[in-house]
Amino acid sequence: QFSLGVMYDNGQGVSQDYQKAFKWISLPAEKGDAKAQFFLGCMYEDGQGVSQDYTEAIKWYTLAAEQGESMAQSNLGHLYANEQTDKLDYIQAHKWFNITGAKEKEKIEQFMSPNQISEAQKLARTWINEHKDN
């Protein structure tokens, strides 16, 4: 199902159709497939095959990120750091950048207080400790 959705998304062997891609990718995402959840997050973030919805993007990225999908973790950091969205949250951005080891965390620190940085680092450490067996 996921592969068929990606084929529709890319127009590989079928006519490109973002709505069909969304339909086919949603099925495994709903069943817990992390790659499909990540892909669905991208579709919501970009408004591809579905209306753009940052809340839904965060939901799907988070589900994938909790399973260790590193690209979803990175995208969460970027989404939370994006001033163009209504989801701006430097603490969450820093947390996810910490988890992925992304250098972007240093860029957003200029907008954060020392307490916020400390809180983000604590959240990242807690998350890593809770997921170290995954």
Task: Give the label of every model feature segment.
Residues 1-10, 39-46, 75-82, 106-107:
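Hydrophobic face of amphipathic alpha-helices that form TPR/SEL1-like repeat modules
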Residues 8, 12-16, 30, 44-52, ...:
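Short coil/turn and helix-start
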